[in-house]
Amino acid sequence: MLEARDITFGYSKNMPIYQGFSLRIEPGERVALKAPSGFGKTTLCRMLSGYLQPAAGEILLDGQPLPRRGVCPVQMVWQHPETAVDPRMRMNATLAEAGVGDGTAKTVRDPSIEPEKAELLERLGIRDAWLTRFPHELSGGELQRFCIARALATKPRYVIADEMSTMLDALTQARIWHVLVEEVERSDAGLVFVSHSPALTARIATRVVELEG
């Protein structure tokens, strides 16, 4: 279970965004976070995935703090994928960070990429030609597919998706959400997501958490 236990956080000491806030997400749950813009949904996502530390309280996985080293069992997919990758690395090297290939792959079915992971890349629509490109040579939708593949390839216990498809066309949105939900269901992983689409939330969420008030 992923848990935020009595957390307090604020960018200003006098104006906490969260004070004594708690949330539990069970394995297999798909939880949508709902709140007005600027309320702190992204901040909560960053805390749940270990990128921010609360001023008080704890973020726990099965009762233990998130690991500070190695691959984190809670993976986050950001709204702006260009902020989540090294601009100096080709995409095959970016995938290799998650154990997908050896950093030199020129095709999705390269011998260095395990068949199961190659299948994931294909389902996300990642093309051979993209593997040797740098992030700035890809569109936002193309780059986001790599970020999702990198997160899922680590077989996380939980995935945190912060408005990951907001800037994508409808066809790409449908494809990546289908793959993401299929993967978390297959592994009984939990999913926490933020989306401003009521239709998407209704289709995917098993629970909606209202953060306001």
Model-derived regions, located:
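A short, flexible loop at the N-terminus of ABC-type nucleotide-binding domains that lies
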Residues: 1-4, 8-20
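Conserved ABC ATPase signature
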Residues: 134-138, 142
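Q-loop/switch helix immediately C-terminal to the Walker
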Residues: 80, 87-104
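Conserved ABC transporter NBD signature motif
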Residues: 57-70
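Helix-to-loop junction immediately C-terminal to a conserved catalytic motif
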Residues: 49
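Conserved ABC ATPase "signature" region
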Residues: 111-129
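The feature captures the beta-strand-to-loop junction immediately N-terminal to the Walker
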Residues: 34-36
